[in-house]
Amino acid sequence: FDAQGRYIEFAKNTFPKGMTLDGLKVVVDCGHGAAYRVATTVLRELGATVFATGVNPDGTNINLDCGSTVPEHMCKIVCEARADVGIALDGDADRVIIADEQGKLLDGDQLMALIAEQMHNRGQLKGGGLVATHMSNLGLEQHLDSLGLHLSRTRIGDRYVMEYMRKHGYNLGGEQSGHIIMADHTTTGDGLVAALKILSLLAESEKPASEVCRVFTPLPQVLRNVAYTRGDLLEQAEIRECIVAAQRQLGKRGRLLVRRSGTEEKIRIMAEGENESLIRDVVENVAGAIEQQAG
């Protein structure tokens, strides 16, 4: 049973028939993880000139200073090799982050926007938009709205994105962190398949990645974590009133998300909007109220 060989053929079959990556210089960082053989093989068989890194797993070095969680390593190689594009996968290869030819990063929001627009133009996008989480940038939502598409949001986690997609008939979804779910091909995030979609658009356009892949300007986003050790602070009246006041202050100019971490004893506060000074004030006010009650 040749699992690697079958996956290589599956991945290549998601790439447009008759198209190649001839002449494209691609850096791929496999994070010393699951895709360390298959990603480089697929890219080379499609014709790309491949500069590979993160392809020497030893059982302990997965994601160590490499891959999509530390994409700066990949960006550096893109610039040194004068590559056309860089791809960083995480250890289990379900996430992808892209770098343009200047070594500048493109997160999952940018990739989803690009894929959605292309699928929409070709009549392939189902559900009238895409599914993402509450962490996706408001700029993505505004960009989709300008195309007559909508963004449906779920709680954080690619499993919740997929559940919503199945329930409501979408075929594209994902997370800002680089999980991209293309339900016509897979039922979970597949970093290589998503990367191949982006590479096909690059090959088709014959333009630099910086022009093709940066489709909207993200709005400023401010994140703050507040540690706590007791009780459900977000249910306290003083904090709820502060959050409501902050949301009223932002109005339609921004968005505020306050939630408990699912993995740590922390409350995460995120605000975004066109006025960075305003959103910083909002985050500091909410964080201050939480810290006062937590103290």
Residue ranges and their predicted role:
Residues 1-81:
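Gly/Ser/Thr-enriched, mixed-charge loops and adjacent short helices
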Residues 9-12, 37-44, 72-75, 79, ...:
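Predominant activation on well-ordered alpha-helical scaffold segments within soluble catalytic domains
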Residues 28-31, 63, 105-108, 128-133, ...:
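Glycine- and other small-residue-rich loops at beta-strand/loop junctions that grip anionic moieties
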Residues 32, 91-95, 103, 178, ...:
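Short, glycine/acidic-enriched loop or turn micro-motifs at the edges of active sites
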Residues 47-54, 105-110, 148-156:
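Short hydrophobic/aromatic-enriched beta-strand-loop microsegments
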Residues 60-65, 117, 161-165:
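Short, charged, surface-exposed secondary-structure boundary motifs
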Residues 84-85, 122-295:
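Phosphate-binding and adjacent anionic-ligand microenvironments
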